């Protein structure tokens, strides 16, 4: 069992799955959305994530003319789990508070779009 929450704690969730793989997206949309080098997510089946509280605090935004959406807490603005796919949830790895001890970066995606200052190391 894994647990997570937004920065202010208004949105909380549980995941009934063993979490191991982190996907780091370096596309320009994810970089702008986070203000960083991209976003690190854990992908879980929809039926494995349960909202504990604050589902009514979640705001979804779709980028016009793009197949991209983001979900965030309306109180603190932190990214929260969301769906860009009918079967899977994309859980921001940094939002996990428990159950993420086995997580390791397994894949970097959209590396060709990474920021010029972003260096991806071997360790």
Label every model-predicted segment.
Residues 1-123:
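A short Gly-Trp-Pro
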